[in-house]
Amino acid sequence: MVTFSSGKAVTFKDVLSNLHILDYDYYFNVVDGLLAENATQPLLLLDEILRKGFDGQNFIVGLSEHLRNLLVSQDSRTVQLMEVPDSIRKKYAEQAQACSPSLLLSWLNISNQCDINYKASRNQRLTVELALMKMANVNAVFKSNGKGEANATAEPAGLKKKLNP
C-alpha cells in the first residue's frame, strides 16, 4: 500500500480504492433506502458503484453478506460469526434493530436469486436493479396483502394472485 500512497499517510479510503473494495457505508446506505421502501436511493448508489468500475455481481454478493451480517447481529449469541471491526459491528447492531428477521430473509432470498441468475442474464445491470426494486417493495406487497410484514419468500402468494387473476 505504501507504493500507492505517494509518500503521504495511508488512509482507509486509499486502501479501499487501491484494492478495489466497496466501503461498508455503501451497503448501510442501500439498506437505509430499502427500509424507507424507496428504490431510488439504492438504484442511484448502484449506478455510482458501477461507474466506479465495480462489477454488479460483486455488489450483490456484498449486499447479501451485509444482509446476512444484519441477521446475525440480531442475536447476541451469533454476533461473533461476523468478521468485522468492532466499530462496524456497532453499526450493524444499530441498523439490525430496524429490520425484522423475516424482512432480512426475504431480502436475502431476492439477492441470492439475483446472484444465481446474474451470469446467465443478457442484461446484468437490469438483473441487479430488479432485485433492488423487489427488495424496496417487499414490505409494501405484504402490507397490501394484509399480512403486515414480509415473510421468508421473495414472491408472496398475494403477488401471484394479482399477476394471475
Positions of predicted regions on the chain:
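Long, low-complexity intrinsically disordered regions
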Residues: 157-165
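Extended, largely alpha-helical regulatory/partner-binding modules appended to the mid-to-C-terminal parts
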Residues: 1-158
